[in-house]
């Protein structure tokens, strides 16, 4: 007569649970039929994998794991020795009787065993745990650390119009004004020949929950320190545009921040962190991160409506006595989010004011230069961060013999930005997302430019920019066969926004451009997808500003094709 005693894993002392389990698994294959043997092998593989993971993560040492396995082996041998001899059938073969365990019960046992082992390792240590308080602390710290990242491989073809204005014409007869300082300074600059390049972008982020209210973050990325908008690394390139010959890449700190959440919905951030404002790449480039201090607040208004607001102060440069004044950005944004309908439809709208302080160019004088020791120009808009498009004027003194050329911004910048996004959930997983963005520079004006530049009458340029975009498909590419396509049009006036922070891809970067964008994404595996984007741009105004009613037209058209392979983890 056989007696079956039911015993669940939870009824065993935690200090003996794994040892007895492994012992049973070691003895099991010798007592089981084919199907039961397969199930036991699966369970044994699960437990052994769990033990190896605990060793790898420092929760228990390899010596402890080996000792556990030896104890389990001895227990298995003891169990087999104590077992009664099996019955023998008429054919002389041993008869094995195995009680039936339903699949649902076996699955529950596996899950419960895993939970019990993990629970025991999260304890405070002591006799009932492994590794004591130090290992428990490691396990706890690991549970509060989040690691994420992505890698993008890009092939890019840039086709510049054969009828584009040559670089030499950008500076002929125009000494004091420009909208393309890099081309103005180099009469041999390329404005007509096509460019092909391959690029890689890699980002690795760490986010640690210090407490429930405090988060610290750090992100490393490829890319240089000479521009804020891009984290791309061009292959086969060395320093100062020399050939790379397998030269290694440099990593930069792209984010380093501490975020506080003292109240529900309120987030205070300091350091270098992700863009806290709703917007598009018409104003802020996709890869741009902010540095400074910001506060964001989200508040539900009712079951469908919620409000949000963000504000921040961001230093651009600090005051250097006798050399330069402080420059900064002060920003505020407020908006609403409406969830409507029986499907997950949403309408999100926001209005923002981005006000720059101290960035306008100041015309230098002979007196300035003669009274200040080791004098340098104080309001230059430098080549390390500017792109193209903003109206610039020569800020150097007009004194005889001063042949240097340094450029300053002819306009101030106080940008009023209105952004809206309508997300319509259609049949199945498909969404139609319509996006609009309109921005105007409240500090732009020909009279202001004339006073600032010392009498230069600029009669062209624009303070207005807008973007419209429609996207159809899955909102996010996460699984294989996910896809979306989009089409957009933009027109960004020369001085609608500061050209340093807008898109670095459209029209080769900067402002004073208009045109179309077509794009598509397709998932090939989980968190792995292909992207294609085509951009076609032309100028809005001449790159040589119209001075005193004398126009100097320029042409600069660019078609850009980008093909990407993306992997996210």
Task: Please report, for each region that a protein language model flagged, where it lies by residue.
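Surface-exposed coil loops of outer-membrane beta-barrel proteins
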Residues: 227-343, 348, 352, 357-407, ...
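Outer-membrane beta-barrel pore domains
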Residues: 2, 6, 37-38, 190-191, ...
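N-terminal periplasmic/intermembrane-space "pro-region" immediately following the signal or transit peptide
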Residues: 2-7, 21-188, 569
């Amino acid at each position: 007569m056989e007696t079956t005693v039911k015993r669940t894993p939870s009824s065993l002392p935690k200090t003996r649970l794994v040892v007895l389990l492994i012992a049973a698994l070691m003895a099991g294959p010798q007592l089981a039929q084919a199907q039961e043997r397969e199930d036991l092998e699966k369970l044994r593989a699960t437990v052994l994998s769990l033990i190896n993971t605990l060793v790898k993560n420092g929760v228990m040492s390899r010596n402890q794991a080996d000792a556990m396995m030896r104890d389990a082996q001895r227990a298995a041998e003891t169990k087999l020795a104590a077992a009664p001899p099996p019955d023998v059938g008429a054919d002389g073969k041993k008869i094995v009787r195995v009680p039936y365990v339903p699949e649902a019960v076996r699955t529950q046992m596996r899950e419960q065993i895993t939970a019990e082992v993990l629970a025991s390792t999260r304890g405070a240590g002591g006799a009932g745990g492994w590794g004591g308080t130090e290992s428990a602390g490691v396990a706890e710290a690991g549970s509060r650390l989040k690691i994420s990242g992505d890698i993008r491989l890009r092939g890019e073809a840039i086709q510049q119009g054969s009828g584009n204005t040559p670089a030499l014409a950008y500076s002929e007869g125009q000494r004091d004004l420009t909208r393309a300082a890099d081309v103005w300074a180099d009469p041999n600059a390329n404005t007509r020949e096509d460019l092909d390049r391959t690029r890689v972008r890699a980002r690795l982020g760490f986010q640690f929950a210090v407490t429930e209210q405090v988060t610290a973050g750090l992100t490393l990325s490829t890319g240089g320190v000479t521009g804020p908008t891009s984290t791309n690394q061009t292959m086969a390139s060395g320093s100062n545009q020399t050939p790379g010959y397998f030269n290694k890449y440099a990593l930069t700190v792209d984010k380093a921040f501490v975020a506080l959440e003292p109240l529900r919905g309120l987030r205070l951030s300091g350091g270098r962190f992700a863009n806290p404002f709703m917007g598009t790449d018409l104003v802020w480039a996709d890869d741009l991160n902010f540095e400074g201090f910001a506060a964001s607040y989200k508040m539900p208004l009712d079951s469908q409506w919620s409000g949000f607001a963000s504000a921040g102060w961001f230093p651009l440069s600090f005051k250097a006595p006798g050399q330069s004044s402080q420059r900064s950005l002060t920003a505020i944004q407020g908006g609403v989010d409406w969830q409507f309908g029986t499907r997950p439809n949403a309408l999100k709208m926001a209005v923002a004011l981005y006000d720059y302080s101290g960035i306008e160019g100041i015309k230098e004088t002979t007196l300035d230069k003669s009274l200040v020791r080791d004098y340098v120009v104080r309001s230059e808009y430098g080549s390390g961060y500017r792109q193209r498009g903003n109206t610039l004027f020569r800020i150097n003194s007009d004194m005889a013999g001063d042949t240097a050329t340094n450029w300053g911004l002819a306009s101030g910048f106080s940008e009023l930005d209105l952004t809206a996004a309508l997300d319509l959930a259609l049949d199945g997983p498909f969404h139609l997302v319509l996006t609009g963005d309109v921005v105007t520079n409240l500090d732009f004006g020909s009279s202001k430019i004339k006073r600032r530049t010392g009498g230069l009458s600029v009669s062209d340029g624009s303070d207005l920019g807008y973007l419209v975009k429609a996207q159809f498909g899955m909102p996010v590419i996460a699984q294989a066969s996910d896809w979306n396509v989009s089409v957009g049009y933009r027109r960004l006036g020369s001085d609608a926004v500061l050209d340093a922070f807008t898109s670095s891809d459209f029209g080769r970067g900067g402002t004073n451009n208009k045109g179309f964008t077509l794009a598509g994404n397709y998932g090939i595996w989980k968190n792995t997808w292909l992207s294609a984007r085509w951009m076609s741009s032309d100028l809005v105004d001449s790159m040589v500003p119209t001075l005193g009613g004398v126009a100097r037209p320029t042409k600069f058209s660019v078609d850009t094709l980008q093909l990407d392979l993306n992997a996210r983890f």
